[in-house]
């Protein structure tokens, strides 16, 4: 059956995601970044993902188009510096005949290639032909504890609310 996976090039580039602490950040009394510091540090790495999907002929013999928006996070560049990779949700980019565009906070847009996605984990990867963009700093989620404060930054309801910050706590 269908595994829920799609890979454009399974032998393509590999990106290592490592914890990269920033020694210049302000922390709270527990040594954790404050909400303001999280926003300042992560917001430049947040992108909008705009997709359109052209469905094949409907009952009337016409092509139909659907569109949607989501959030992505800049992972980093490939070794050549030619491409930048973006993590997003699989449900945003999955489908046939999907055209994706990545939009930066300043409005700059790039056509994006769907590298692959896994519907079961809802993780997708895009790539754009760009360099010099600020990649997000990734931590180790296995070090989180129940009750610890966490934050999410994204574009709820599309790019109109670009870089919205919300907070919560780790549950079980």
Residue spans for each PLM region:
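Serine-dependent protease modules
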Residues: 3-172
